Swiss-Prot record:
Keywords: ATP-binding, Cytoplasm, DNA damage, DNA repair, DNA replication, DNA-binding, Nucleotide-binding, SOS response. It comes from the Bacteria. Belongs to the RecF family. The RecF protein is involved in DNA metabolism; it is required for DNA replication and normal SOS inducibility. RecF binds preferentially to single-stranded, linear DNA. It also seems to bind ATP. The keyword ATP-binding applies. GO terms for molecular function: ATP binding; single-stranded DNA binding. GO terms for cellular component: cytoplasm. ATP binds at G30, N31, N32, G33, S34, G35, K36, T37. It is found in: Cytoplasm. This is DNA replication and repair protein RecF. GO terms for biological process: DNA replication; DNA synthesis involved in DNA repair; double-strand break repair; SOS response.
Amino acid sequence: MAISRLLVEKFRNLTAVDLDFDPCFNFLIGNNGSGKTSLLEAIFYLGHGRSFKSAVTNRIISYDEPHFTLFGQIQESQHQWSVGLQKLRQGNTLVKINGEDGNKISDLAHLLPMQLITPEGLTLLNGGPSYRRAFLDWGLFHHQTSFYSAWSNLNRLLKQRNAALAQNQPYSAIKIWDVELAKLAHQVSQWRAEYAEALRPEIEQTCQLFLPELEINVSFHQGWEKNADYYEILQQNFERDRALNYTFSGPQKADFRFKAQGLPVEDVLSRGQLKLLMCVLRLAQGEHLMKEKQRHCIFLIDDFASELDQYKRALLAERLQQSGSQVFVTAITQRQLKEMQVENKKMFSVHNGIINALN
């Protein structure tokens, strides 16, 4: 999977962009604030329908413009697609695939599996459980065809139940939802547990390469007592849930936990080690997708050199090259990319929102 061409209009400070990319490595060189992270953000938005920088659409659309537009040409093996996304200031999103309307963001996400590595991405490890649930759910979205529908229905039922709890409804009014909610909760949790277990040896093996000085242990917690019947828990805890106005236990509390030397990694590891572990997780997940589904991720790496010494940068560069994935990397200077000794690459300079190819 690779983006061969990208057009960007009215997105942040970027001047109208029309770029052809290398299917392997693409380097974006420029000072802070030049627009190189904005280009990564545009690529990410094309594959997710949202930004990794801001939840406020009006901050992303160029000043005094009604919308921004993204268009990409995608190649995978012998197949090619054109994808387009337009976001209006009023909030509406228009999605086209091969020129046809009526597509959803989830259709774009399926076409464009992406892994994002940024300085802010450490929330995967030191943030709340929701970041790690999202990590697992991303994998299941691409591995398990029935997951997205089940996950969407599960979230819908949880919202309905929480609304009923907030309205102080009796259990007789909620019981009918609990039957289906429990069924979906067990299914989603089983998928998460199986995916976490499949990923665990790949994570631990990659950790031995990047963090040989540490023993990293990985575990999945489903969000309620192991081996307990979730339907019974919903019944038993109804009064507590009603007092809280929300459902306390369940798959919405699941977590994918990482420990080093028996302690949570955020309490033990340095920022540099946390960044390496984040890279390990993204690499392992991308490589697992390739192994199981024969699909490559697109890797977006912002500020490649930060927090990593020369040896670790060389290790990461080598592993990315071995993955066969398309990679986009930002850096302030070309010197920061000297460990990226790759043959197939394109170099771009970014200055005040203007992007030019250097080779």
